[in-house]
């Protein structure tokens, strides 16, 4: 894999399912074992907020694999451009 990505296991509003989902998805955590199966120069992405120790291991989130902070930074500018486009006078 060139890119490894994940999201939170429990969405906002579904907190009552959190403990059950942790049990079900534990084997899908992005950690060094999983990243070792990806390409040497693979990157890790996450839409944030991340739950450290659940869907993502601390080591990966803070590693050279992680492009999470750049992804978040880019999302800011993508959102700004979309808002400008939607609010602009379209002919």
Residue ranges and their predicted role:
Residues 1-59:
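Rossmann-like adenosine-cofactor binding region
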